Amino acid sequence: MKQYLDLLDRVLTEGIEKGDRTGTGTISVFGHQMRFNLDEGFPCLTTKKLHLKSIIYELLWFLKGDTNVKYLQDHGVRIWNEWADETGDLGHIYGYQWRSWPTYDGGFIDQISEAVDAIKHNPDSRRIIVSAWNVGDLDHMNLPPCHAFFQFYVANGRLSLQLYQRSADIFLGVPFNIASYALLLQMMAQVTGLQAGDFIHTLGDAHIYLNHLEQVKLQLSREPRPLPQMKINPDVKNIFDFQFEDFELVNYDPHPHIAGKVAV
């Protein structure tokens, strides 16, 4: 994906070296945008192999409103283990905010259900937004949300999604985020009777950790390959009814995986 490789190249060329919360050190730029037209293929990185199983199960976990790693671990996914407490809980992170945003009167807002309803019945609304950045709840999250909020846009029978990501680990995290939100867009388009349009990924602090520089250079040396296609079970009409078996990535021919250590 040229958009992603251009981002890597920009950060290597223009990035400023900065300290960070983890003590690892980064080079970063502030403000970057990538656009992916899903008509051109599913944006799953080809210059290194991604673990699609983790991406799908994590998204289903978010949509369940779950915040305990047991569901992920039961399906062989370990990407959240480092931030979980001794009971496996992560606090009021993504799934909680997406499905159970607390209100002042003691109630809860299911933002995903409201987004589906708005897309179907008020598609011209400029308020079709789902936010995980709940300022009053940040102290109850083991890790504040990096991909903070996203907005839907309906035009000419197509549904598009724009994500704002405040903190973007470009080598490890961003490829997962691209694939995850592109998949969410396809799922939301299907259940609302629309075609999937563009996924727009807007980044705030876009950084490469200093211990990932050699991996990034290796990735930039590889020639991108044609994008795969994501096939989704057409019989699923409710956003909360999707199962892992409803997804099939076809014609995915990536370069080999490149390992990198997660900064915790």
Curated annotation (Swiss-Prot):
Signal peptide: none
Entry's localization field: Cytoplasm
Main location (coarse class): cytoplasm
Residues annotated as binding dUMP: R21, R126, R127, R166, S167, A168, D169, N177, H207, I208, Y209
Enzyme Commission number, as recorded: 2.1.1.45
Reactions mediated catalytically: dUMP + (6R)-5,10-methylene-5,6,7,8-tetrahydrofolate = 7,8-dihydrofolate + dTMP
Leading EC class: transferase
Family annotation (SUPFAM superfamilies): Thymidylate synthase/dCMP hydroxymethylase (SSF55831)
UniProt entry keywords in alphabetical sequence: Cytoplasm, Methyltransferase, Nucleotide biosynthesis, Transferase
Molecular function terms from GO: thymidylate synthase activity
Active site: C146
Pathway(s) per entry: Pyrimidine metabolism; dTTP biosynthesis
A GO cellular-component term linked to this record: cytosol
Superkingdom of source: Bacteria
Swiss-Prot/TrEMBL GO biological process terms: dTMP biosynthetic process; dTTP biosynthetic process; methylation
Database matches in InterPro entries: Thymidate_synth/dCMP_Mease, Thymidate_synth/dCMP_Mease_dom, Thymidate_synth/dCMP_Mease_sf, Thymidylate_synthase, Thymidylate_synthase_AS
Annotated (6R)-5,10-methylene-5,6,7,8-tetrahydrofolate binding sites: H51, D169, A263
Disulfide bond keyword on record: no
PROSITE patterns: THYMIDYLATE_SYNTHASE
Assembly behavior: Homodimer.
HAMAP family assigned to the protein according to its UniProt record, in alphabetical order: Thymidy_synth_bact
Record family assignment: Belongs to the thymidylate synthase family. Bacterial-type ThyA subfamily.
The protein's role, per its UniProt record: Catalyzes the reductive methylation of 2'-deoxyuridine-5'-monophosphate (dUMP) to 2'-deoxythymidine-5'-monophosphate (dTMP) while utilizing 5,10-methylenetetrahydrofolate (mTHF) as the methyl donor and reductant in the reaction, yielding dihydrofolate (DHF) as a by-product. This enzymatic reaction provides an intracellular de novo source of dTMP, an essential precursor for DNA biosynthesis.
Protein name: Thymidylate synthase
Species: Bacteroides fragilis (strain ATCC 25285 / DSM 2151 / CCUG 4856 / JCM 11019 / LMG 10263 / NCTC 9343 / Onslow / VPI 2553 / EN-2)
Gene giving rise to this polypeptide: thyA
